[in-house]
Amino acid sequence: MTETFKVAITFVSPSSEALAQSIIDSINKSADTTRAIKIQADMRDTDSPLRIIDATICAFGPNIDILVNNAGVESLVSLSELGLQDFNECIDVNFRAVVFMTKSVIPYLRSPGRIINISSSSAHAGGLSSGIYAASKAAVEALARFWATSLGPQGHSVNTVVPGLTQTDMYERIIAEESSAAYHRTVASMTPMGGRVGTPEDIARIVSLLVEPRSQWVTGQTISATGGLILL
């Protein structure tokens, strides 16, 4: 099944802007009209959700069908080194932004709407950091279960996708440190399917499946996209 969507892609930094622009160019070159736009938004800013919605409806009209809550920032500091700034940044981006982005989209979400939260395998595994990142992602999974119940009567589904290690900009920054690189190589080797880390395309395919009409009966679910590393 081939679906055609109009897409608003957000980015934060100049480095991510280049990637966002390349995706937009790829989408728009195959269409007669503009089908993709980019929006600069730092989800630490409390006004970002409304700015994203405003820019989206200005470009494409007042109906929104899908929201993917994908913004994230990782905290690798230990509990003994955890500061209030580290805590707030992680919670603000990974949790608070999901709450208020979803709140902002609801008035424009056309039934049957789809909301996809992106969690992390860290929410289901131990580690050596403070655990704030894992906790913030576990909270996102809890939100999806509650919203699936409260938004279901309006025809909306809410699900969570749980990626494992995935080759993103954040991943590349983390493995730049040799100690982190060794750990990630070990985890990758433990992945049953292929012994590798995931790719953005691996995760996108799962999200794509969840937004299809044939997935309308799936809601409130937490779906592992880890190549079998995390079994839920």
Curated annotation (Swiss-Prot):
Broad class of enzyme this protein falls into: oxidoreductase
UniProt protein name: Dehydrogenase OXI1
Residues annotated as signal peptide: 1-20
Pathway assignment: Mycotoxin biosynthesis
List of glycosylated residues: 28, 117
Active-site residues annotated for this sequence: 119 (proton donor), 121 (proton donor), 133 (proton acceptor), 137 (lowers pka of active site tyr)
InterPro entries: NAD(P)-bd_dom_sf (IPR036291), Sc_DH/Rdtase_CS (IPR020904), SDR_fam (IPR002347)
EC number from the UniProt entry: 1.1.1.1
Alphabetized GO MF terms: alcohol dehydrogenase (NAD+) activity
Annotated keywords: Glycoprotein, NADP, Oxidoreductase, Signal
Gene (name only): OXI1
Family classification: Belongs to the short-chain dehydrogenases/reductases (SDR) family.
Disruption phenotype: Significantly reduces the production of T-toxin and decreases the virulence to maize.
Any Pfam family hit: adh_short_C2
Keyword match NADP: yes
Species of origin: Cochliobolus heterostrophus (strain C4 / ATCC 48331 / race T)
